[in-house]
Amino acid sequence: MDKLADLNYTLSVITLMNDTLHSIIQDPGMAYFPYIASVLTVLFTLHKASIPTMKIALKTSKCSYKVIKHCIVTIINTLLKLAGYKEQVTNKDEIEQQMDRIVKEMRRQLEMIDKLTTREIEQVELLKSIHDNLTTKPVDVIDMSKEFNQKNIKTLDEWVSGKNPYEPSEVTASM
């Protein structure tokens, strides 16, 4: 385990790989050498990083299948990114989480639409009642049967006949 974290050991392995590649491929003008070296470096790094991580994860976790699946998906996604692909591999758990998030957001939006619709209906009903209260209704005949103080009211005919209904008929003075 100490050798896995040792930087000198890692650098010596990379140097050994490069020396081996140089000895195998004698032609210095070979065009594919940097690509091969890059792929081998990435594979070596993945090997050195994933083996101890998976050992620790398997010892500490209760569900080793999910850990292994997650590590493999991560390695495949890393290789796809290095190859230049934009697509990624996802496991069912991530898809289910995304679907749950989408369904939750849709429910939230439906509740908001329901609240807004209810408020709009209430506003329309309020505007209708305000409109009904503000509209004037034409009245042909005024019903005077509910009026008070009708005993002293003179009609228009008495006024026309020359008698003023507002003049007192008797004048009394106190002494």
Curated annotation (Swiss-Prot):
Signal peptide: none annotated. This is Non-structural glycoprotein 4. Homotetramer. Interacts with the immature particle in the viroplasm. Interacts with host CAV1, early and late in infection. Interacts with host integrin ITGA1/ITGB1 heterodimer. Interacts with host integrin ITGA2/ITGB1 heterodimer. Interaction with microtubules blocks trafficking to the Golgi apparatus. Its main location: host cell. It is found in: Host rough endoplasmic reticulum membrane; Host membrane, Host caveola; Secreted. Keywords: Activation of host autophagy by virus, Calcium, Enterotoxin, Glycoprotein, Host endoplasmic reticulum, Host membrane, Host-virus interaction, Ion channel, Ion transport, Membrane, Metal-binding, Secreted, Signal-anchor, Toxin, Transmembrane, Transmembrane helix, Transport, Viral ion channel, Virulence. Plays an essential role in the virus replication cycle by acting as a viroporin. Creates a pore in the host endoplasmic reticulum and as a consequence releases Ca(2+) in the cytoplasm of infected cell. In turn, high levels of cytoplasmic calcium trigger membrane trafficking and transport of viral ER-associated proteins to viroplasms, sites of viral genome replication and immature particle assembly. The secreted form acts as an enterotoxin that causes phospholipase C-dependent elevation of the intracellular calcium concentration in host intestinal mucosa cells. Increased concentration of intracellular calcium disrupts the cytoskeleton and the tight junctions, raising the paracellular permeability. Potentiates chloride ion secretion through a calcium ion-dependent signaling pathway, inducing age-dependent diarrhea.
